[in-house]
Amino acid sequence: MSFQRTTGTYRNSHPDSQGYYGRYGGIDYPAELRPELAALAETHQLAWNMPDFQRKLHDARIYFQGRPTPVHRLANLSAQIGGATLFVKREDLNHTGAHKLNHCVGFALLARHMGKTKLIAETGAGQHGVALATAAAYFGLECEVHIGEVDLEKARSNVSRMKVLGATVIAVGQGQSALKEASDSAYNAYARQYRHALYAIGSAIGPHPFPLIVRDFQSVVGQEARQQFMAVNGGALPDHVVACVAGGSNAMGIYAGFLDDQGVSLHGIEPLGKSAKPGEHAATLTFGTPGTLHGSHCIVLQDADGNIAKVSSIASGLVYPGVGPEICMLHDAVSFTAVDDEQTVAAFYRLSRTEGVVPALESAHAVAFAMQLAARCHPSERILVTLSGRGDKDVDFVMENYSD
């Protein structure tokens, strides 16, 4: 059965007691790790409802992260397009330059609460690695980050930042040497070190309770955005909310503020890469089928024999052959569209030169679609886009490989 949006409190309904979002999710992990995951789920649920834990989280949000991040109108771009008015939620202004710190701070607090001394994770574009290293340094924890060798070359500045912050960086050379392989490597490291380390997974993927934990700590984005948008629009909500989608941390963060509002259309933008040919994109929801990846039942890109397919995108953070279980459940409640590399680069340049905001290539996927959507909407409509990260990491790559 597919999920349908209804009026009510969404968070209290999903996932179920077994960690399922509809038919997706669950726990497909080795038996020896299941007690650890059960303890993590219990700890998160208890901590989430503890005033002292929430106070520490609130203080970190304000004094360390610099939250709330603003919502503002893209007046210049909206005037150029001439349709709906565009607004952005500026997660690029979150400390470290992306939304990733939202759940990294949460994982660090959980690790300390559980008596763990180390955080382990994977990273693609490097933003999650930087955020995790930052949170680990702030909370006095060790940090180990796994990154594919291909991504390491594209994100050297972020890799240097991780090392400056004290993280151990592990380069992964297997397979495509990208995000999936980094995730495999990080999981293997966690399986060896779980007694003293916590796997601070990079997105809303993996076995229960990881998707829930990431969504809960990212929900601050949607909560803030809802209040901020209404404050500058006379109490009105946006007609459309747009976010790029891979694992789902960014999308679930902004959706969390609007899932109970049936009048708000939600959009998820996938990477079409170079083309719709197999191996040249990472548009999982567009072309994928049900399967299992990294401990969770979800939609994946795979061949007829069930082998995980090769994937491609200009945005390293979106080069993943699966999608989180909660996003899978929302397949019929959210409108999913794929945007290719060329459209993404065009949006990257246009937002930079029209508004003075350089977006991450991941975020530029959402911007590209939002511009298309605005052009066909009535001028009375309003579109809110999550700018999940800044594009410092991408500037050299884009300038060297794509003429403006």
Segments predicted by a language model, with ranges:
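Buried hydrophobic positions in well-ordered alpha/beta secondary-structure cores of metabolic enzymes
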Residues: 26, 70, 88, 100, ...
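Claisen-condensing/thiolase-fold acyl-transfer catalytic domains that form or cleave C-C bonds
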Residues: 245-249, 341-402
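Active-site/ligand-binding loops adjacent to catalytic centers
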Residues: 183-209, 213, 263, 268-357, ...
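Active-site-proximal loop->helix
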Residues: 120, 128-186, 277-288, 394-403
